[in-house]
Amino acid sequence: MATFVVPVLNVGGMLGPDKNGVIKYIDGQVQTFDTVDVDMICIPDLEGMAKSLGYPKYTAMHWLHPTATNMEFGLREIKTDSDVNQLRISLVENGCVDFHYEHFLAL
């Protein structure tokens, strides 16, 4: 049986410390995408989501493990198919994860 999820991307903000020094996503917005089958998620699809939001190039792609107590220890980089498999497992277990893309600012 297929498991469907809604990808959630954080855009327009930045990762930085709050007043207590805890790393948070600051001043961004949340963008959701159409429902996808977890088994069909792949790196090119995740790259396509970033491009559709105006981020044609990025330096790193991350997902936030939903059970993490903070972003400093909860961000997981996506580089390989194995990383995507860990993402899929978390999506099935938790129903949702947030995606973050490191990118250069266009000036």
Model-derived features: where do they sit?
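Phospho-regulated scaffold assembly regions enriched in serine/threonine/proline and acidic residues
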Residues: M1-L107
